[in-house]
A protein has these predicted regions:
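C-terminal motif of bacterial Sec signal peptides marking the signal peptidase cleavage site
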Residues: 16-20
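Bacterial signal peptide processing site
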Residues: 22-25
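A conserved helix-loop-strand patch within extracytoplasmic ligand-binding domains
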Residues: 37-51, 137-139, 149, 155-158, ...
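Bilobed "Venus flytrap"/periplasmic-binding protein-like clamshell domains
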Residues: 40-71, 77-87, 175, 201-228, ...
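Ligand-binding clefts/hinges and TM-proximal coupling segments of bilobed small-molecule sensing domains
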Residues: 49-53, 57-62, 145-191, 297-301
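Ligand-binding "clamshell"
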Residues: 97, 110-123, 264-277
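Short, glycine-/small- and polar/acidic-enriched structural segments
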Residues: 107, 216-299
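Periplasmic-binding protein-like
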Residues: 111-152, 279-287
């Protein structure tokens, strides 16, 4: 009887010890897993990927250079996509509060919709603030002086542009969003049309690249030109062909030249074949952008 009780007590004690060890081991395993996931670096969380836009864009070339010049980015990959696809990836990550790193620029509606920040760029790869500039074909001043006057005097602010971009992003047709802005900002528009005579159905072609900022500006300028009697055709092209179209006379002008960085190569190639009318927007910026909740403030933190 004594042996039987002793045996049962031993079995019970062994069972309790095994259960305790198993529970501790399971707890430690889960804890380690959580700790590992929680301590993943930003680089690991985004799988060493930067979400880019169209290949060939100035910001893509700058980012490729950043991957070369920043030692901590040696194992990173720049993912080519489009401005629309980049914005879609940003929105999906932001809604889940997941980290993401994108090639970004302002003005852009994403800064109005999301809490974002630029990563500091100690090496100055992305340069200082950019301007968006207007270019026209040679001879436009003589052929279509009223259009030339409007394009020469067109100038607005990042806030102006953002208002149009946000309306478009929220579902408005670009032409309708532009028409609304023109109607609501008649004083500013009158400054652009000052000295421009009305015309009777003359045709004019404006080239633009399919970035949200340029969709906004090109549609606004198009509406202003329509207001003084022009029949306006907007031609969507990639950045290089946009400059080429103006240089070759296939387009009369464009308000989409980002300088001195983004479109520098195209200006080098076509600059002597087009006429520059100066900045139509100041304070534009490009760089690597992350949601504000991402625990990194500099490219060197990645």
């Amino acid at each position: 009887m004594f042996k039987k009780k002793y045996y049962l007590a031993f079995v019970l004690l062994a069972t309790l010890l095994l259960a305790a060890c198993g529970g501790k081991e399971g707890s430690t395993g889960d804890g380690n897993k959580g700790s590992s996931e929680g301590s993943d670096s930003v680089a690991e969380q985004v799988d060493y990927k930067i979400i880019g836009i169209e290949p060939g864009a100035g910001i893509m070339k700058a980012t490729a250079k950043a991957l070369e010049d920043y030692e901590n980015l040696a194992d990173w990959k720049l993912v080519e996509s489009s401005s629309a696809a980049m914005a879609s990836e940003l929105q999906k990550a932001y809604e889940k509060k997941e980290p993401i790193i994108i090639t970004g620029w302002t003005p852009h509606w994403k800064f109005a919709k999301f809490d974002l920040k630029y990563l500091e760029d100690p090496k100055g790869i992305y340069g200082e603030a950019e301007t968006i500039e207007t270019f026209v074909r040679q001879g436009l001043k003589d052929d279509q002086p009223s259009a030339y006057t409007v394009l020469d005097q067109f100038f607005w602010t990042p806030d102006d542009m953002a208002a149009v971009m946000v309306d478009i992003q929220e579902g408005a047709d670009p032409a309708d969003a532009a028409a609304k802005w023109v109607e609501d900002n008649s004083d500013k528009v009158s400054e652009w049309t000052n000295g421009a005579d009305e015309v009777d159905g003359e045709k004019i072609k404006l080239a633009y690249v399919a970035w949200d900022s340029e969709i906004a500006s090109s549609n606004v300028v198009g509406k202003v030109l329509e207001g003084i009697g022009y029949k306006v055709e907007l031609i969507q092209l990639e950045a290089g062909p946009m400059f080429a179209a103006v240089a070759q006379g296939d387009a009369d002008g464009m308000v989409a030249g980002w300088l001195p960085l983004t479109h520098a190569d195209y200006l080098d190639e076509y600059g002597d074949k087009i006429e520059g009318l100066g900045a139509n927007l100041e304070g534009a910026k490009t760089g690597l952008v992350v949601p504000a909740y991402v625990e990194a403030d500099s490219i060197e933190d990645l």
